[in-house]
């Protein structure tokens, strides 16, 4: 930690190279540094789809080698300034200058200063899986999409498409991650640790993302939820950064119920044939992350494609209704609904529809509750790895649903990433 006042800073300067430098060698004969950059210039390798469309994917990294003459002091100072600019570290100074807000200022949805009051009291972060912008929204005429790549367009995802008739369409939103192993870090920590990033593509410490138990897979600055907890804000975590302890069915058996069992249970519950879910206490989960364990809903499923998202929503809904009635809806709720990933028992189209319905139901319940006027719902993918996009493999759907998320024009093409959403 070079920011610590207790540690002498051994860094004399910084040299700009490629993305994710993983090794360096000094050529003493030529007085040069040779730096191997794991991700180099990023995922700019393109290929043509079966439809003849040039497209990109998150796995097409272009590694590079930087050959850098050993700089003198003046050149090193210039290089250091370039690194500072490349990494936008000047923005960190802007954040510091935005602190010191006035708690007595007039509340607005997004305060200009940290510490100013906000009209938003309840934040819901819905995490989904693996889709590019074009895969889901390529058929939306208002945005920069390619309809030929919209394999899960409006026919499979009518609810998220309907959202865009009222709320903003972001057609220039990106997930920095390659896949789940670093995607969950980007969402919850606003960065993937160096120890995680240079493992690409193996990720022996953190894959599959929410299942990591190694502290080296986490940023030392903490998580979105640990910061909320440190600020004394109530929060609940549904599925993120957790692992299963065991399954235990009502008859005492410890095998996992089938997808059909969970689905039938949800149908009966939603139709009023059951007052509670038969399998609601089947799952017991835990987390090795203390900030998660203290706020974890322990009967909510983790990443498991053998469980429909309707069951997840029904579990959350029971909890949400109790909180609404008691006036205890948390400030921050994280919900991981992942059937959009595909790979479970149903067909891919059915899994997309299951997830789309789940997202629609969550928004429907929140928007018809007494906390809607003070709520903001953020929806994003952990990564965009399982598809292609005609702009960039990292371009992904991102949604903000709130009384304060006003649609202005056909699309917002401002460059945003998961970091912007986490920061907001």
Spans of model-derived segments:
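N-terminal pro-sequences and low-complexity stem/linker regions of secreted or lumenal proteins
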Residues: 80-424
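Predominantly soluble domains enriched in secretory-pathway, periplasmic, or organellar proteins
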Residues: 1-108
